[in-house]
């Protein structure tokens, strides 16, 4: 099962992949053996196919062995070895004759160190992924065993309880238990607890913890590599860290100043708002007073007008009374004048008659 998984998982190049496999079957196809050409050709074809098959098998075995060794190293917390291909390339390039090698050695050292770190980190991550997959497969394989053990323990507990109940039926006194039985029960309970704890630990949270541990291990190794760097790089990183801290402090102070400025502006705006609120209240009170005054003035005007109307009405009534009285007096005077006119007419007529009579008498 583990070999099938390892063949399906994408793996990194191991140390043994660079080695050339020497096949011992080449002696069969060598010339000068005293055989015919036709038979030699058929045998050479067969030998080449056999050699290819053997090489493939050997390569597979070597890959499996290398992967198993890497997994063992991971299990015993060994640091994975660097790739031999990168080391060989580095040695080959360093051995080449280069006139400017002394000047550019420091720059090339940093580049090679970075490449080496990348390769080791990639290999380590791939090996950790393999270990995680293998642990998951082992858990899936042993899951049924854990479940069977748990079921057996629960069944044994139930049977023990039933037996105890049967023995206790019809008896008032409790039965005495020997030391061996008590210890055996404790041992069974401890086993069941251990099995349950193992089952719980093999749940989904277990793999999350594994991933967290892997992440922590990677971070620790990176920190160790950073600490093991030479003093110049350490000083440079410390200087950069100090610069970052200073920049962060400057940014924090700038933000604090901006916050204080904004707070002052907010306080000023609050004061302005309070002043405008006070003015608004004053204007509102004045408007209320003006409304009252206008209402009172209108009421006064109305009252004065009503008084004037009453006075004019009373004067009108008085004048009408006077006019009626004067009209009555006029009528009386007119009647008197008529009476006097009648009397005058009578008097004048009497006088005319007297004159006529006197004239007649005179004649």
Swiss-Prot record:
**Is Coiled coil set as a keyword in this record?**
yes
Query: Where are the stretches annotated Interaction with IRS1?
Result: 1-93
According to the UniProt entry, its GO molecular function terms are: identical protein binding
Q: Where is the composition biased (Basic and acidic residues)?
A: 102-111
Q: Could you tell me which residues carry Phosphoserine? A: 23, 25, 27, 104
Q: Which superkingdom, per the lineage?
A: Eukaryota
Main location group? Golgi
| Localization terms from the record | Golgi apparatus
Q: Name one GO cellular component term.
A: Golgi apparatus
Q: Which Gene3D superfamilies match?
A: 1.20.5.170
| Chain residue ranges for the region called Disordered | 20-111, 145-171
Q: A GO biological process this protein is involved in?
A: positive regulation of insulin receptor signaling pathway
Here the disulfide bonds are none
* Family of this protein: Belongs to the GKAP1 family.
- Partners and quaternary state? Interacts with PRKG1 and IRS1.
The entry's protein name is G kinase-anchoring protein 1
Name of encoding gene: GKAP1
């Amino acid at each position: 099962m583990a070999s099938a998984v390892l063949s399906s998982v994408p793996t990194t190049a191991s140390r043994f992949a660079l080695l050339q496999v020497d096949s011992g079957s080449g002696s069969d196809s060598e010339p000068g053996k005293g055989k015919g050409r036709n038979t030699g050709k058929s045998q050479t074809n067969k030998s080449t196919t056999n050699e290819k098959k053997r090489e493939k098998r050997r390569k597979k075995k070597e890959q499996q062995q290398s992967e198993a060794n890497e997994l063992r190293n991971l299990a015993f917390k060994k640091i994975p070895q660097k790739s031999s291909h990168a080391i060989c390339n580095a040695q080959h390039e360093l051995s080449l004759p280069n006139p400017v090698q002394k000047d550019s050695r420091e720059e090339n050292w940093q580049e090679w160190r970075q490449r080496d770190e990348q390769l080791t980190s990639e290999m380590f991550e791939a090996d950790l992924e393999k270990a995680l997959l293998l642990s998951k497969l082992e858990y899936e394989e042993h899951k049924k065993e854990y479940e069977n053990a748990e079921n057996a323990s629960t069944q044994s507990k139930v049977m023990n309880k039933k037996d105890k109940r049967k023995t206790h039926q019809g008896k008032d006194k409790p039965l005495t238990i020997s030391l061996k039985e008590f210890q055996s029960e404790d041992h069974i309970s401890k086993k069941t607890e251990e099995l349950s704890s193992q089952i719980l630990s093999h749940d989904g949270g277990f793999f999350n913890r594994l991933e967290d541990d892997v992440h922590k291990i990677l971070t620790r190794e990176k920190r160790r590599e950073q600490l093991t760097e030479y003093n110049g790089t350490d000083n440079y990183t410390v200087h950069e860290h100090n610069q970052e801290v200073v920049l962060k402090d400057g940014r924090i102070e700038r933000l604090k100043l901006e916050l204080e400025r904004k707070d002052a502006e907010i306080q000023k705006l609050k004061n302005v708002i309070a002043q405008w609120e006070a003015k608004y209240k004053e204007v509102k009170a004045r408007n209320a007073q003006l409304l009252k005054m206008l209402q009172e003035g209108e009421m006064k005007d109305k009252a004065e007008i009503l008084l004037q109307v009453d006075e004019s009405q009373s004067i009108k009534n008085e004048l009408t009374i006077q006019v009626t009285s004067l009209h009555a007096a006029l009528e009386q005077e007119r009647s008197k004048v008529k009476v006097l006119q009648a009397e005058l007419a009578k008097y004048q007529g009497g006088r005319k008659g007297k004159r006529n009579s006197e004239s007649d008498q005179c004649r």
